[in-house]
Amino acid sequence: MIHKGDNTMAQKCISKQFIENEMEFWKIPSVAIAVVKDDEIVMSEAFGYKDVENKIPATPKTQYGIASCSKSFTSTIIAMLVDEGKLDYDVPIIEYFPDFKMYDEFATKECTLRDMLSHRTGLAPHDALWIDTIDRSTLWERLRYLKPMAPFRAQTLYNNTIYTLIGHIAEKITGQT
């Protein structure tokens, strides 16, 4: 547990008893909480076990899978880049990145951030690709080989792989990971 400075408000709002009650009610094995004030972490604490079977406690540094919550972060970063004029939702990706290539010429020339963010690329989920098996730049190169499940923009097909590539676009624009 880390507590810095005056954090009595954080402690009042986030009581240990409340957290433990919620964990028990929802059958949550562990949770980590951080409170940030003025760009500084004023409280960081973990509860429960990261490994219940072996009774290994969670710590503030325990990493948790956040699954599709990352899509909110990714789309927010893209919105910020659009707001800054560094990207446009409706400009084809290939205009920013000439090495962008999809399964056919039409999709390659027309695909925009709007298409990617709204799951309208026509690509099947290909979920096995996004689970830490390959890095983003390799996935970028392999995009051209992924087969569609529907014609481009014909229907919405939920796609984790495309969101991984949207994150890669943000990395390429900002130079940050």
Q: Where is each model-derived feature located?
A:
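Beta-lactamase-like hydrolase cores
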Residues: D6-D38
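Active-site-proximal loop and beta-strand segments within enzyme catalytic domains
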Residues: F25, D51-N160, H168, K172-T177
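Residue-level signal for well-ordered, solvent-exposed loop/turn and beta-edge residues enriched
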Residues: E40-I41, K86
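Amphipathic coiled-coil signal-relay and dimerization helices
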Residues: I41-F47
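A common structural microfeature
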Residues: S30-A32, S44, Q63
